[in-house]
Amino acid sequence: MNPSTQIVVKMSNEELWKERYPNMEMISNSKRITPIFPEIKFKISGLEENSRYVLVLSLEKMDNIRYGINENKEWAPSSARKPKPHHNMKFFFHPEGTKLGKELMAETVEFTSVRITTSEKLSEKENVFYVHTMHKYVPVLTIRNLTTGEIASNIFKMEIAQFFPVSIYQQASMGRWKSDLNKHSTFGNRSEGGIKRKTSDAAGQLPSKRSSKKPVKKDVVDNSEVTLEVKTSQYLVNQNESNLTEYIPSSPLYSSQNQYQYPFHPYSPFDSSIPYPYSPMDYSYYFNPTFQSFSPENVYFDENRNPH
């Protein structure tokens, strides 16, 4: 790399992060994986245009402190609870693979598929990071030049994008703020002072359109005990736990009344389901020009042993 060139990395949606800095919260729990919003997106400059780079994202704890909301409704170190021990670091490579420097600088580098959870089991997925609630995390981008083969990597801690994983929003306005910016966001605020769709009437607000709809009843079905059979004149489909099989009654390979009439289906001469007396490994009958089918009429072949 040219010594005079310095790589610069910024959050492309930095203004959004600044609105909640340094008190950004992200919903995370052990039951499911949840997205990060604002999303993790970068603008990069200072790369060598014709060099190829690999980009790796990680989420790191900024310190070994457990936090909580103080009397001023701000995040502060908690004196009541001890911090959780550090967990293993995870690295997530950019989904689009390696790219040239000029390509990376011309676009917004996105890690929008990243998810977080407090379940170690769910975090086994490639794009899911395991986090501890009530601790402070920061996205870290690592950039390495593969063309020059340099050992040293450029590491960028994006402190503007630090956040606290929480099971429910600790700040009353966080859920509303995210919902206004992102239609996929849920409220999830704590009960004291938080804005919830269920209590919008009690709070003196008009109920949202979503909450005014009548609940839709859904039948609970155990897929492990359900077999769906759809019969037509051409096929029978059996569906059990999403396993789909097709049954063709007219085929000699599958039809019980025909399976002993034809040693093989003309279009699959070496099929392993050939019944006795012809062994699947014995192909001599196939190359025998005098061979005749067990059928009263050899309707499957012409005189040159080619299937009709």
Curated annotation (Swiss-Prot):
Chain segments annotated as coiled-coil in the UniProt record: none
Alphabetized UniProt keyword annotations: Developmental protein, DNA-binding, Nucleus, Transcription, Transcription regulation
GO CC, alphabetical: chromatin; nucleus
Main location: nucleus
Phenotypic effect of disruption: Alters embryonic vab-7 expression pattern.
Gene3D superfamilies: Transcription factor, T-box
Molecular function, one GO term: RNA polymerase II cis-regulatory region sequence-specific DNA binding
UniProt cross-references to InterPro entries, sorted A to Z: p53-like_TF_DNA-bd_sf, T-box_DNA-bd, T-box_sf, TF_T-box, TF_T-box_CS
Functional note: Involved in the regulatory network to control embryonic patterning and morphogenesis. Implicated in negatively regulating vab-7 expression at the anterior of embryos.
Protein name: Putative T-box protein 30/42
Annotated organism of origin: Caenorhabditis elegans
